[in-house]
Amino acid sequence: MINPLTLYDSATETRRKNIYEDVTGDLLGYCVITIKYFYNFDDAYIDLGGSSTRWVSNDPDYRITADMTFVSGHDDHVKVTVRCVPLGEGSSIVKTYTLSVYPDGELKG
């Protein structure tokens, strides 16, 4: 299941980013979230494993980072924080999502 999430700059409304996330893995072992980010037809991928952060972006104007952590006391919930940091002028955009992961690997949120 793929759900669209939207990350946008509310100050200008001109740079709109669509984030799609998909979950694979096993809650008893590991959980991997892949976020696919589109901007100006350039795509980048953020892969999250455990609490580590990895990012790749071919958009020269932004650095995209993301972090995933399991919600304390709830092994079936993850918190994803996505940061969009402009390398020039402008404000950083930070969005946090709490998502539920079910044993079949499907993401709800």
Feature locations, PLM:
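Mature secreted bioactive peptide module from preproproteins
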Residues: 2-109
